[in-house]
Regions:
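Conserved anion/nucleotide-ligand pocket segment
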Residues: 156-158
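A residue-level signal for conserved active-site and pocket-lining positions in enzyme catalytic cores
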Residues: 132, 160
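Nucleotide and nucleotide-moiety/phosphate-recognizing core
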Residues: 1-125, 133-154, 169-172
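SAM-dependent methyltransferases
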Residues: 161-178
Length: 178
C-alpha cells in the first residue's frame, strides 16, 4: 500500500508508540521471514483466533499493545494513549463506530487479562471481548479517539482486494499516510 507493506506500517507505528520493537504473534511457518528483525511467537493456544493472539501477547510480554496487522492507519499517539491507560485498568479499548462500538484488536492489555482470556477460551467464548467482564476495562471514548483521527480511517481493516483499493485511495488522499 503506497509502496510499503501494511505489516511494516503497523510495526513502525507500534515501535514509535512503545519505544521498542514489537512482538509479532503469528502461526505461519514463514512468519520469521516477514520481519527478520522481530521476535516471532506462535499462539500459546492455537486455534482461538484473535483472542489466542492477545493471550500470547500478554503471556509473553506482560502488558501489550495489540494491533491487527491489517490495520494500516492506526496512530502511534492513539496507541501511546491506550498504553498510558493501563496505569488504571487491565485493558484499555478505544470506542469506534463498529458494530460492537469497540476496537478490541487495537487495544492495550495488561497481565491480568491472561487468566481471564484463558477462562473465556475454556468456556468456549473466543470473542475478542469475551473476557472483558472479568477484568477492569477502560474505554477510550470516541470523542478522545477523534483527537487522533477519524475512527473509520484509524481502525480500517484490509481484508479483501476491494479493501486494499480503498486503503490505497485513503493513503493517496492523506499526506500523513504516504
Amino acid at each position: 500500500m503506497g509502496g510499503r507493506r501494511i505489516l511494516d506500517r503497523v510495526v513502525d507505528v507500534l515501535e514509535r508508540a512503545a519505544g521498542s520493537p514489537p512482538l509479532l504473534v503469528a502461526n505461519a511457518a514463514d512468519a520469521a521471514q516477514w520481519r527478520p528483525d522481530l521476535a516471532v511467537v506462535p499462539d500459546v493456544l492455537p486455534g482461538h483466533g484473535s483472542l489466542g493472539g492477545i493471550l500470547t501477547a500478554v503471556e509473553t510480554a506482560g502488558a501489550a499493545l495489540c494491533v491487527a496487522w491489517d490495520m494500516p492507519f492506526v496512530s502511534a499517539d492513539l496507541l501511546a494513549a491506550l498504553a498510558a491507560g493501563l496505569a488504571a485498568a487491565d485493558a484499555v479499548v478505544p470506542e469506534s463506530d463498529s458494530r460492537r462500538g469497540l476496537e478490541p484488536l487495537c487495544a492495550a492489555y495488561g497481565p491480568a487479562c491472561g487468566p481471564a482470556i484463558r477462562a473465556a477460551i475454556a468456556r468456549g467464548d473466543a470473542r475478542a471481548i469475551g473476557f472483558h467482564g472479568e477484568v477492569r476495562v477502560a474505554r477510550l471514548p470516541r470523542a478522545a479517539v477523534l483527537q487522533y483521527g477519524d475512527p473509520a480511517v484509524l481502525f480500517f481493516n484490509v481484508n479483501t482486494p476491494d479493501d486494499l483499493a480503498r486503503a490505497e485511495v485513503i493513503c493517496r488522499n492523506h499526506a500523513s499516510f504516504r
